[in-house]
């Protein structure tokens, strides 16, 4: 009788054990404000895709505390709000592999990234469409960009499709309409259960054709509360709603975690019912923007005296230049070319 009772207890234990979902995979979309950072955890292995901006660096480093090593860190593109936070991670945590875009960045921030990677000792590779690798039991494929001659640096963002069991997750940095359409034309399989919304929910991304191909059940928007860009845009929110997607928002809900056992996906938050964007901030922020506009009207181009390239004042590369290399000028394009300067390949002045 005792033996039968023991057998029943053992059977019950394993039955209950089998009925509890295994937290084998997690996708963390970190609350880094107006930026993006995604942590993939698969069977005790880790991949960090982007690290948010400078202001988020200490938060990201703290969030990763307890992880002994990162299998991989990836930079989708060289926007400050996506890769500045990675520098602190490289300084504090061992990493096997650093994946960077197939074009070079500029300025102090880029040099700090290169120095951090060198100090860390990780292997550095340039990500390209079609590249595949594993993180634990997760399969990771780079599906974009499909070309590198885009005028916008956003469209050059590395795009990662992560598969675990029957579930898939899509993270594409700041990819916009042109890159999205090229992926739809070129990539065989784009379906993803969870879509980390491109470019923080900008109206220039998440077009209907792209959403048709991805066909997500869940979408996570990473953006800062009350950000100056109006992210997420009403147009993008409407498109997501029209596709019947459940949305999660870091600006409203903080860090979002999607759990999976390879079959089912569940979140640590209920889906957001906030289908409106945040209004443009006023007051001090508006005054700051107006002052910047006045300053940029005083000159035509900004030159990098080190690289001998000239840029539009609002080019992202301008903020990354060293102060001693930054030259403001009202010279014409022809005059700058005559002096040996070349136009920036990103802003195409």
Identify the residue ranges that each predicted region occupies.
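Non-globular, low-confidence helical/coil segments that flank catalytic cores
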Residues: 2-3, 18-297, 345
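Short linear sequence motifs
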Residues: 6-8, 56, 303-304, 334
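Bacterial N-terminal signal peptides
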Residues: 8-19
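Mature, structured domains enriched in cysteine- and short glycine motifs
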Residues: 277-349
């Amino acid at each position: 009788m005792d033996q039968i009772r023991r057998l029943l207890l053992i059977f019950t234990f394993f039955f209950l054990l089998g009925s509890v979902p295994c937290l084998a995979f997690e996708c963390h979309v970190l609350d880094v404000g107006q930026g993006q950072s995604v942590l993939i955890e698969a069977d005790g292995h880790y991949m960090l895709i982007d690290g948010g901006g400078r202001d988020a660096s200490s938060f990201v480093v703290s969030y990763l505390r307890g992880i002994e090593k990162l299998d991989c860190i990836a930079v989708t593109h060289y926007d400050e709000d996506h890769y500045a936070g990675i520098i602190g991670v490289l300084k504090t945590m061992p990493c096997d592999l650093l994946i960077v875009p197939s074009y070079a960045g500029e300025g102090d921030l880029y040099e700090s990234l290169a120095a951090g990677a060198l100090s860390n000792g990780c292997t550095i590779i340039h990500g390209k469409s079609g590249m595949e690798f594993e993180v634990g039991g997760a399969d990771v494929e780079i599906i974009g960009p499909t070309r590198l001659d885009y005028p916008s640096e956003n469209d050059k963002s590395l795009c990662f499709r992560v598969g675990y069991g029957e579930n898939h997750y899509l993270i594409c940095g700041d990819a916009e309409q042109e890159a999205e359409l090229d992926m739809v034309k070129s990539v065989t399989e784009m379906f993803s259960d969870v879509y980390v919304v491109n470019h923080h929910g900008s109206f220039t991304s998440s077009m209907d054709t792209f959403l048709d191909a991805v066909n997500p059940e869940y979408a996570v928007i990473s953006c800062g509360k009350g950000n100056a860009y109006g992210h997420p845009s009403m147009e993008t929110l409407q498109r997501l709603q029209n596709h019947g997607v459940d949305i999660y928002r870091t600006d409203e809900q903080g860090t979002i975690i999607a759990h999976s056992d390879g079959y089912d996906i569940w979140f640590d938050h209920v889906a957001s019912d906030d289908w409106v964007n945040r209004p443009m901030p006023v007051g001090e922020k508006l005054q700051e923007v107006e002052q910047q506009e006045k300053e940029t009207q005083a000159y035509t181009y900004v030159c990098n005296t080190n690289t001998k390239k000239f840029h539009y004042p609002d080019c992202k590369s301008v903020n990354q230049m060293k102060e001693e290399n930054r030259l403001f000028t009202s010279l014409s394009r022809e005059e700058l070319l005559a002096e040996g300067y070349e136009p920036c390949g990103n802003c195409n002045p």
